[in-house]
Amino acid sequence: MATVHLPIRQLVEFLLRTGSIDSRFTGFDRALEGAHIHRKLQKAAGDGYQAEVFLSVERQAEGITFTLEGRADGIFTDETGTVVIDEIKTTAVPPEEITEDMNPCHWAQGMVYGAIYAAQQSLPELNVRLTYYQIDTDQIIRFIRRFTQQELDEFLDKLLCQYAPWAQRRIEWDVKRTQSLAALQFPFAQYRPGQRAMAGEIYRACRAGKTADCKGGTRLFCQAPTGIGKTMSALFPALKAMGEGNGEKLFYLTARNTTQTAAEDALTRLHTAQPELALRSVTLTAKEKVCLHPDAEGHPACLPELCPYANGYYDRIKDALTALLDGTGSFDRAALAGAAKRFSVCPFELGLDLSEWCDVVIGDYNYLFDPVVHLKRFFDSSGDWLFLVDEAHNLPDRARAMYSARFCKSSLTEAKRALGKGKSALKTALTKADKALLEARKACIQLAPRHSSQTDAADPAQTSLLPENTVPALELPEPLYAQDSTVFLQEPPSALLSPLRAVQAPLQDWLEANPDAEAHAQLLELYFAVQDITRAAERYDSHFVTQLTARGRELELQLLCLDPAPFVDASLAAGRSAALFSATLAPPSFYRSVLGCSDARAVALDSPFPAENLGLYCLPNISTRYRDREASVQAVSDALARLVQARTGNYFAFFPSYAYLRQVHEDFAARYPGIRTLVQESRLDDAARAEFLAQFVPDPAETLLGFGVMGGIFGEGVDLAGSRLIGCAIVGVGLPQVNPQQEMLRRYYDAQNGFGFDYAYRYPGMNKVLQAAGRVIRTPEDRGAVLLLDDRFAQQEYIRLFPPHWRHIRYLRSCEELAAALQDFWNK
């Protein structure tokens, strides 16, 4: 008999939920405040009240064994000796509109818990109590119904019989999919060099899974240079492992949309090579990008009265799923949009609902790692999931950003102005919070006066200490570090967080009472900003610091996650195994440390391309340190000219900053006007990015030199194969700009392991260097030249970070030697 694991809430909501998507402001964060209220009510219930009781049972229906699991909010025995199952719900519905039958799902959930508990405890009957907590009035409204064990059993059996056709569909598909994947063949005639090795590593990691002596399943770091075919080398073995019963679902997580497209293309290749392949996939895209009915400002308007795709969504979604799940499907962005129009359902929510029925889910990192937007339907508990994390070198910075939060004082000032004249509870709360942040701004200026000069990472500005006999305007804790109008504290001051928390309730009231006000959108944005900072305060621990920065009249408060390791570790622990891969994951000790995978296996594969196809040169007589940049401009221009004059073609020059890029470009364009150039501008959208890259045509009649920024949109994730790019120059070692935040990061890791400069500057910088250099040579037939410009490339601290296929680097003493070496390379 087939077995289906089914969370109780999922069973109830799938069958009984009706109506529309409605994302209007409801006055509270359901997940966070709801949990707080649950704990508050559970604690107030007394000693005999059992909170969060885990219940599990196996039940048969229609020839299927269902394993049901869930947590009852509370179980207790009342004064009459009757057992009561308590189901707690927080709501913004006005008290007078809260009725006994306003949501059938609520009763159903309590009744299923009651059926399980009554059977396990041999209870002839029990009570189910709905406890509604009205968040605006703090009013508690309760409804109680008595059920016999027979009534509860019959109700549960009815639900399972209704769900059985869907379960049978899942069972039949799982069998078909597993058999199909077991017979899956590699879609190419042969493996590329290194491809079989990478595939083998990932296959073994997926098979080992939870049996490994490693927290949360097996972890693997794989550095795979350009050309190995990382996407197929990861997907194919993971799918083969699934075909052997190792993993229920595969999540392919990326940092960029271009990488998602690569995963979609790889799956299409598998389907083309094996048309009978039974495999479903879905690509999850941000709501703003897939919305079919945005408002006048281009934002999703997820209200039933405004959007036909939101109106009645839950009444139509099962019909849509029935039709879409009849066969194999790859639901990318275009396919979801087409299906959404066909069935008149929201494409974003359709993608989420389809993900439960798909074998491969492709999406951004945030769907797993972000504490706010992660896929709760999967990752609120662990499962037999396989995680493939592409471009994993991007994950440390992305993770830090996900767990951090930022708040600006100006948002309070602007909110007060938007409210106009007159007194109100909201204005009073805004004024108090604004005043608290104003005092903090004064304290920042006193603790860390601004310095106008910038320095190098190797020679940072000195800490600015509080002058003697000076009393700060606000009593802040002893700072960890203070510089350039920025103060870092070990703990967030309650003098700032308390008034911000106090803003929430009156702000909620105002938003609910004034849905059509002109200032509603602005104050809603403020509400979410306050919510973000209070959420971050909930998870704040020793891996965070508080950053206060004064800029003019602005005060910026950040709860800054310096070390995301425990949070990334906890996210990965939700799955069976995780393979994190990139062309640049060196040194592995750094990535294992900052991503919480200390026990992970790490492998580095050799480049599949012949070393002689890459001309690799360095001019170590140029310093691009910040203090030397102005003096280096002409030398850099001359070196770039020698690089591109050696052979007609397309080239890129990558710089550590826009300012330095513009300095060199101005000089280069003036002194070498015969060479065509393109300059990367900041904040390019997708269309402008595509237009820029379209200039890099195959076999050009004239040379083109693009000026770009390391770590930017052209410095990685760009595939210009063949003659579309035959060379690049890397100007500098890519160190992040020296600023108080980077210095705090350095100090943190100095205290943790003594490698602060490496963790904050050198390793991230060299990662950008290697990514940029990897734009050259994309296929075995490509030939190209890479020029490194900086004396630090000749230092052992940097040489030890070079990949194995850079062993043949040549250090040259002048532009004349460079020209001769390039001529020799291209003539071979």
Language-model segment annotations:
Residues 178, 185, 246-361, 369, ...:
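A substrate-engagement module of RecA-like helicase motors
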Residues 234, 261, 341-360, 365-502, ...:
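Signature of the SF2 helicase/ATPase Hel1-core->accessory helical subdomain module
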Residues 57-154:
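Mg2+/Mn2+-dependent nuclease catalytic core
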Residues 620-631, 682-793:
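Conserved RecA-like P-loop NTPase helicase motor core
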Residues 336-361, 371-378, 506-623, 631-633, ...:
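A contiguous, basic/glycine-rich beta-loop/short-helix subdomain that forms a polymer-engagement track
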Residues 656-681:
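Conserved helicase motor "Helicase C" RecA-like lobe of SF1/SF2 P-loop NTPases
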Residues 173-223:
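Conserved pre-motif I regulatory segment
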Residues 1-78, 82, 108:
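Metal-dependent nuclease catalytic cores that hydrolyze phosphodiester bonds in DNA/RNA
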